[in-house]
């Protein structure tokens, strides 16, 4: 049973825990499948300058693998930190501010990473 204030704030038992649980498992499975190719790409990039890195990242399959890994890992990070914040931050204003900061941080990391991969893969 939620109070009207809790409904407005969208905090409390929203019965979305199961979907968050499965989303986190889905992103974890995606990262498990993508980690070996990502490690291979990182090893290929060791010791290369920007031109060499752009040449390797210019390959469409490699860029796609890295982009998928970035999206999966930042989404996984967002969900995991949100669960920790919801469980352990008890002051409502601090909880709301922390969730907003978490969302902003994860979006910023994903955006910057995607931009970097796209810029390097385009050869600019």
Model-inferred region functions:
Residues 1-124:
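Membrane-embedded alpha-helical bundles that constitute the cytochrome b-like, heme-associated redox core
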């Amino acid at each position: 049973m939620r109070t009207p204030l809790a409904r407005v704030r969208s905090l409390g038992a929203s019965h979305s825990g199961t979907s968050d649980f499965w989303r986190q498992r889905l992103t974890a499975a995606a990262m498990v499948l993508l980690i070996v190719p990502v490690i291979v790409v990182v090893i290929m990039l060791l010791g290369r300058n920007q031109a060499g890195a752009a040449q390797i990242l210019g390959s469409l399959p490699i860029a796609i693998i890295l982009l998928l890994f970035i999206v999966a890992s930042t989404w996984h990070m967002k969900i995991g930190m949100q669960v920790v914040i919801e469980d352990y931050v008890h002051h409502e204003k601090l909880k709301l501010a922390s969730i907003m900061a978490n969302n902003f941080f994860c979006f910023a990391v994903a955006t910057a990473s995607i931009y970097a991969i796209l810029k390097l893969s385009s050869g600019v």
